C-alpha cells in the first residue's frame, strides 16, 4: 500500500458550540484526540490543520501541527494546506477534528477502495449524496484540484469530490461495518457530547 497521510481538519471557529469544541471532553478525552487516534491507526503521518492562532498544545505524540493562514476561507483552504504538507504521501485520508467516532474499519475500507481502483477520491455514500468527510484522496491530483477550486472562489469541502474522479461506497456496504453510522457523527453543539 502507498504511503498514507492522515489529515485532520481542525481550523473551524466552533461558533455553534460557544467555545473551543476540540478541547471539550468526549468520553473523558479531548474531542480532537479521538479523530487523531482513529486516523493514526491507519496512516503513516498525522497532520492536524489548525488556525494560525492555535498552538496545538497537548496534541498526541506523532501528530504534526500545520497552520492554515487563510483563516476564514473555509475547510477547502484547510484541506489545501494539509495536502501540501503531505508531500511524502501518495494518499491522504481526511477527517474533521470534531468526528470522534469515525470507524477505523470504515477508514480501512475507504483506503482499500482507492488502492484497488483508478479513481482519485473515495467517499461514503449517504441518502444526500457523498459525504465530504471522511474521504480518501490521491494527494497530488487532489492538491491540484483544490488549488483550482480555491482560485475559482469555491470553498466547500465537498467541491473536491465534484471535480475528481470519485468512487462512492454504497451506504449499505459501509454501514455493515458501522451500523450506527457513527463515522459521520460530528459535534456541533455541547449537547452533541452526550450522544
Language model segments and positions:
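Nucleotide and nucleotide-moiety/phosphate-recognizing core
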Residues: 1-181
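Glycine-rich phosphate/pyrophosphate-binding loop and the adjoining helix
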Residues: 174-195
